């Protein structure tokens, strides 16, 4: 059931196998994004992870917005069998992750090295192009200066004779310096590439093992114990050196009762960490997922009437820039935080901020194309009348055919459903591995052991929630996804306005 491997030495140009970790419930968004952004194939999933094949380089991989972390896949297989009481036998099972198929490890390391070298070359070429442009500008300035002096010679030939000679000498010196500098940079560029190759030589690698263990194996061993066993096996088999503080390579291993996955983190920083967000509000992956559902088109009027720190608008404006965005809130502190985020992201001229109440929007009826908002959670926010008043005002300003995407708490969502058994969790009949929107991809009892490609399971779960939702006035539910916010769960719900509300 292990992942099929390419020939050893095959690079990313032949398509490499990756996987992303995702917040619970966001797997369908990651799957859509890798297909659309990376032209990914062989897209599969298990709870919390999405696997795919792509030829994309690091620059494109960095652009993923819905995923948490990205890994180059080494191995994916059934869980380890922990039936023996002998720790030695269990440790041998762990070591088989390395010893049983060393080719998959060497192939992954080769692809990882090629990705880094290709990225380094592109970075160097970009810097060299910038330097060449600067040199060209400098040469043009010298030529312009020389022409100006020649014009002055016609009027004051005697006085400027010496100056012309001096400028000619400066020009020759500058050209000589430019030639030497360019030659030096080319040599430096070549040295850096050779150094990169030496640094990533497979025999001289330094590494660290990071483990996550849950289920039966998590009860029997700590992550540190497993990491030590795996680390020793790697050192013996490949001759690499352990370095816990500053390794060249990190090995990630996740072991549980459902699967065993081994990979290499492609980036040290999480994809969900946005450099352009100064103060985080709603998690960026959730905000991007909401915006991706809204069908944003160039020229649209997009409103977030409860914008908080503006995370949803920031994510939307970065991805779909040619749009008129408006953020509103009643809190001065929230709006100040949003403004700081806009300045940090360079989006001050893209998003307009208003201090207004969501139930008294100073906008004409049917004037807004899209509304995206995180409905506030917590004890201070009353259910019932308040949530309905908010939806009524959103319905009023939204034009017919427009879209609303909301993040609703479980209580808010329950209030808007016709589910009579509201005290029963929506996924109560599912096992702990069958999250809403997720169908089991790995069934240990199946002889084939194949990870299934997702096609209809997400849609089936989506319909499961939609069946419990009824239209609110002219707002018709279209999609609904249950997602994790960490300590609590919420629902991303999409509505379409079917007809004039008459308000």
From Swiss-Prot:
Single GO cellular component term: tRNA methyltransferase complex
Domain of life: Eukaryota
Catalytic activity reported: guanosine in U6 snRNA + S-adenosyl-L-methionine = N(2)-methylguanosine in U6 snRNA + S-adenosyl-L-homocysteine + H(+)
Family annotation (SMART domains): THUMP
Enzyme Commission number, as recorded: 2.1.1.-
THUMP domain location: 161-266
This protein's UniProt keywords: Methyltransferase, Nucleus, RNA-binding, Transferase
InterPro entries to which the protein is assigned, alphabetical: RlmKL-like_Mtase, SAM-dependent_MTases_sf, THUMP_dom
CDD domains: AdoMet_MTases (cd02440), THUMP_AdoMetMT (cd11715)
Subcellular location: Nucleus
Reported tissue expression: Expressed in a variety of tissues including brain, colon, gingiva, heart, kidney, liver, lung, placenta, small intestine, spleen and thymus.
Function statement: Catalytic subunit of the THUMPD2-TRM112 methyltransferase complex, that specifically mediates the S-adenosyl-L-methionine-dependent N(2)-methylation of guanosine nucleotides, most probably at position 72 (m2G72), in the U6snRNA of the major spliceosome. This modification in the U6 snRNA affects the constitutive splicing efficiency of introns that have suboptimal splice sites and can impact final mRNA levels.
Name by which UniProt lists this protein: U6 snRNA (guanine-N(2))-methyltransferase THUMPD2
Organism expressing this protein natively: Homo sapiens (Human)
Gene name tied to this protein: THUMPD2
């Amino acid at each position: 059931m292990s992942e099929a491997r390419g020939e050893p030495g095959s690079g990313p140009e032949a398509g490499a196998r990756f996987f992303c970790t995702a917040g619970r419930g966001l797997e369908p968004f990651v799957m859509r994004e890798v297909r659309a952004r990376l032209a990914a194939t062989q897209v599969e999933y298990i709870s919390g992870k999405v696997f795919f094949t792509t030829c994309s380089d690091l620059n494109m991989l960095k652009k993923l917005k819905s995923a948490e972390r990205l890994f180059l896949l080494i191995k994916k297989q059934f869980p380890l069998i922990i039936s023996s009481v002998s720790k030695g036998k269990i440790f041998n099972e762990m070591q088989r992750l390395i010893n049983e198929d060393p080719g998959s490890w060497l192939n992954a390391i080769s692809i990882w090295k090629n990705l880094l070298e290709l990225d380094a070359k592109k970075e160097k070429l970009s810097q060299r192009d910038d330097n060449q442009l600067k040199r060209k500008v400098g040469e043009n300035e010298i030529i312009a200066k020389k022409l100006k002096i020649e014009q002055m010679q016609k009027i004051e030939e005697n006085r400027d004779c010496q100056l012309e000679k001096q400028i000619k000498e400066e020009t020759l010196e500058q050209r000589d310096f430019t030639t030497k500098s360019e030659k030096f940079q080319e040599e430096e560029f070549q040295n850096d590439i050779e150094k990169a190759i030496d640094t990533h030589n497979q025999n001289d690698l330094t590494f660290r093992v990071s483990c996550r263990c849950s289920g039966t194996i998590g009860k029997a061993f700590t992550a540190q114990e497993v990491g030590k066993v795996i680390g020793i096996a790697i050192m013996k088999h490949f001759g690499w050196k352990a370095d816990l503080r500053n390794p060249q390579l990190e090995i990630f291993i996740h072991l549980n009762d459902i699967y065993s996955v081994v990979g290499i983190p492609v980036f040290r920083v999480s994809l969900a960490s946005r450099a352009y967000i100064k103060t985080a509000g709603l998690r960026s992956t959730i905000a991007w997922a909401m915006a991706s559902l809204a069908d944003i088109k160039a020229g649209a009027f997009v409103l977030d009437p409860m914008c908080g720190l503006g995370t949803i608008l920031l994510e939307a404006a970065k991805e779909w820039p040619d749009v008129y965005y408006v953020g509103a809130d009643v809190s001065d502190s929230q709006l100040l935080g949003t403004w700081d985020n806009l300045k940090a992201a360079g989006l001050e001229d893209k998003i307009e901020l208003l201090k207004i109440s969501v139930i008294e929007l100073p906008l004409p009826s049917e004037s807004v194309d899209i509304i995206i908002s995180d409905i506030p959670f917590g004890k201070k926010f009353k259910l019932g009348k308040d949530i309905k008043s908010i939806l009524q005002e959103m319905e009023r300003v939204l034009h017919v055919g427009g879209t609303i995407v909301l993040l609703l708490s479980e209580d808010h969502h329950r209030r808007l459903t016709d589910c009579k058994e509201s005290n029963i969790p929506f996924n109560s009949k599912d096992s702990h591995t069958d999250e809403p929107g997720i169908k089991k991809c790995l069934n240990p009892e199946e002889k084939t052991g194949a990870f299934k490609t997702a096609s209809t399971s997400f849609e089936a779960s989506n319909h499961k929630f939609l069946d419990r939702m009824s239209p609110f006035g002219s707002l018709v539910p279209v999609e609904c996804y249950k997602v994790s916010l960490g300590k609590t769960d919420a629902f991303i719900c999409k509505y379409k306005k079917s007809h004039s509300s008459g308000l």
